[in-house]
């Protein structure tokens, strides 16, 4: 049984109690759903902020072909970017990538950019762990021997290698990422999406091509709408050049 009705009721209740500024949604991208219908739905429920999340997979579990995620996101980006409705939702990662491309480094988060990841999880038994999305890497992958009743939160960064890796995940990148022209924007993507049993986190993201294509596409759209004097100060990105580097 789906939980859509319960979620929608909870969303409406949140709006009623806390106001429209807190009417925010997380949405894992499903490329089998019509992106036009998805965008229209978020407008219909008057969502204030929508965060489109990439499906959580690793190099060992991913089934999405290169380009499929971009093709889906491109449709929504075009709808959103051309939408003149001032009440349209703010959609991540679009606003984040635009901010990063314009030099606003504060737009980074655990998915992209060049900020440190400071989120921890306290399990129901009090255990201190890194974010639960890293459990996609394997059973018990985020387990620690640390507990809030016996430890300080910062202890995890001393005693747990995974926590340190996650904290610095946009700085500890594979060689390919460190040489990429988009490294400052992409930041290597989400840590879990780089994982493989064979090489650990020493990989590019499973969504590397899609991220590169999306970043270039967004930059080109924004570039084309800038005044000529600003265009002269900015180098337009070309996906084919990035692709050649990625696949070399």
Map each language-model feature to its residues.
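Radical SAM/AdoMet-radical enzyme domain recognition
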Residues: 1-55
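Short, solvent-exposed loop/turn segments at secondary-structure junctions
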Residues: 30-32, 57-59, 96-99, 127, ...
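Long, K/E/R/D-enriched contiguous segments that form extended
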Residues: 36-108
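C-terminal accessory region of radical SAM enzymes
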Residues: 69-101, 133-178
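Short, small/polar residue-rich loop motifs at catalytic or cofactor-binding pockets
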Residues: 112-116
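Radical SAM enzyme core and accessory elements
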Residues: 125-127, 136-139, 148, 171-248
């Amino acid at each position: 049984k789906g939980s859509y009705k319960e979620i929608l009721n909870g969303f409406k209740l949140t709006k009623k109690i806390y106001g429209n500024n807190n009417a925010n949604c997380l949405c894992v991208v499903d490329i089998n759903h019509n992106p036009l219908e998805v965008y229209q739905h978020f407008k219909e429920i008057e969502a204030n902020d929508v965060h489109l999340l990439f499906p959580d997979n690793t190099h060992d579990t991913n089934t999405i072909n290169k380009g499929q995620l971009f093709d889906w996101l491109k449709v929504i980006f075009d709808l959103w970017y051309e939408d003149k409705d001032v009440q349209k939702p703010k959609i991540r990662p679009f606003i984040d990538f635009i901010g990063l491309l314009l030099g606003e480094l504060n737009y980074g988060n655990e998915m992209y950019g060049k900020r440190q990841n400071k989120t921890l999880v306290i399990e129901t038994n009090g255990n201190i762990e890194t974010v639960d999305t890293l459990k996609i890497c394997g059973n018990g992958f985020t387990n620690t021997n640390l507990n809030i009743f016996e430890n300080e939160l910062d202890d995890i960064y001393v005693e747990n290698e995974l926590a340190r890796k996650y904290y610095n995940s946009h700085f500890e990148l594979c060689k390919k990422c460190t040489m990429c022209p988009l490294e400052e924007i992409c930041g290597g993507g989400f840590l879990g999406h780089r994982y493989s049993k064979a090489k650990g986190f020493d990989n590019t993201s499973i969504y590397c091509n899609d991220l590169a294509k999306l970043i270039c596409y967004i930059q080109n759209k924004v570039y084309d709408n800038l005044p000529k004097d600003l265009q002269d100060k900015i180098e337009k990105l070309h996906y084919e050049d990035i692709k050649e580097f990625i696949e070399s």
